[in-house]
């Protein structure tokens, strides 16, 4: 590891993650025209954001930076894979890793893995259906479309907010911060689907001001403590989302991890670490019995 990378990793442990994220979140919600227009224009240039596919192409039309960052796309900008039974990629970005969940652990990077149960908030019961299953980790870069969509149609069963740190998420931290995704703040969404249980985990990172879902809005428990929200109780109307429907969004980006049970899916042979992906592309197909 280079000296520059060592310095970067050391800074990750020393910086006040949540304070920085709150300050950046405040700036991202600022509506002052002189500020938000300059910030959005700089960001679009810096990261070469393609606004031709956005519903609103005019950078100055966004009320604040977060509205720009979570911008909607034009109809048809992300066609859904048509293969029978296709499991869709949940987001734009790049595959960080994908493969089997072995011995209750998920591969992070060379020399590093993390606990499936810890990713899901330390709940062995929640983790049990995914033991021996498969995972895919999608990293969303700053220039990407930052809404997350359903890989399969499903009925929401449970949502778990898991407090944690906010380490930056990139190749350097993945290779050098142990248990990165099981340490960062995250929201776990559990669904019942035609392929059995499916989890979509929205992982925060440094400067990720908030995580939002379409059914709960901003997921911000008053105290930073683990909190479970159940949606399969008789008193609640079922929440069902169709394949390709928006699930949630990052107000400043990070990572989405999708989990499946054993013998349910076979990943697209053309995908591997660092493969670029777009929401709606074929991530996997049903595994043949």
Curated annotation (Swiss-Prot):
What detail does the entry give on cofactor binding? Binds 1 pyruvoyl group covalently per subunit.
Q: Can you say what this protein is called?
A: Phosphatidylserine decarboxylase proenzyme
Q: Kindly list the positions at which Pyruvic acid (Ser) occurs in this protein.
A: 254
Cofactor(s) the record lists: pyruvate
Q: Per its UniProt record, what PANTHER family does this chain match?
A: PHOSPHATIDYLSERINE DECARBOXYLASE, PHOSPHATIDYLSERINE DECARBOXYLASE PROENZYME, MITOCHONDRIAL
Chain's gene name:
psd
Similarity field: Belongs to the phosphatidylserine decarboxylase family. PSD-B subfamily. Prokaryotic type I sub-subfamily.
Task: Give EC number(s), comma-separated.
Answer: 4.1.1.65
| Enzyme class (EC, first level) | lyase
Q: What does this protein do?
A: Catalyzes the formation of phosphatidylethanolamine (PtdEtn) from phosphatidylserine (PtdSer).
Which residues span the membrane? none
Q: Pfam families from the entry?
A: PS_Dcarbxylase (PF02666)
Per the record, the major location class is membrane
Organism, by scientific name, is Pseudomonas aeruginosa (strain UCBPP-PA14)
Q: Name one GO molecular function term.
A: phosphatidylserine decarboxylase activity
Q: Site (Cleavage (non-hydrolytic)): which residue positions?
A: 253-254
Q: In which pathway does it act?
A: Phospholipid metabolism; phosphatidylethanolamine biosynthesis; phosphatidylethanolamine from CDP-diacylglycerol: step 2/2
């Amino acid at each position: 590891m280079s000296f520059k990378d060592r310095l970067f990793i050391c800074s990750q442990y020393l910086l006040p993650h949540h304070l920085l994220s709150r300050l950046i979140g405040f700036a991202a919600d600022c509506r002052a025209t002189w500020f938000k227009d300059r910030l959005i224009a700089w960001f679009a240039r810096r990261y070469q954001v393609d606004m031709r596919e956005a519903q609103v192409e005019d950078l100055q039309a966004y009320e604040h930076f977060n509205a720009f960052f979570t911008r909607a796309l034009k109809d048809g900008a992300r066609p859904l894979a048509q293969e029978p039974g296709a499991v869709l990629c949940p987001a734009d970005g790049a595959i960080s890793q994908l493969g089997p969940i072995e011995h209750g652990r998920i591969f992070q990077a060379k020399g590093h893995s993390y606990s499936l149960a810890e990713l899901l908030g330390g709940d062995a019961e929640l983790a049990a259906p995914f033991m021996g299953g498969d995972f895919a980790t999608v990293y969303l870069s700053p220039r990407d479309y930052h809404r997350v969509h359903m890989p399969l149609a499903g009925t929401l069963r449970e949502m778990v907010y898991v407090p944690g740190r906010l380490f930056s998420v990139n190749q350097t931290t993945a290779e050098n911060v142990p248990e990165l995704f099981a340490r960062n703040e995250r929201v776990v969404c559990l669904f019942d689907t035609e392929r059995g249980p499916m989890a979509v985990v929205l992982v925060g990172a440094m400067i990720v001001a908030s995580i939002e879902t379409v059914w709960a809005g901003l997921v911000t428990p008053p105290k930073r403590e683990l909190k479970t929200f159940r949606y399969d109780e008789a008193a609640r109307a079922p929440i069902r989302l169709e394949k390709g429907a928006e699930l949630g969004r990052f107000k400043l980006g990070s990572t989405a991890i999708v989990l499946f049970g054993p013998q349910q899916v076979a990943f697209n042979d053309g995908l591997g670490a660092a493969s670029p992906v777009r929401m709606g592309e074929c991530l996997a197909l049903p595994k043949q019995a």
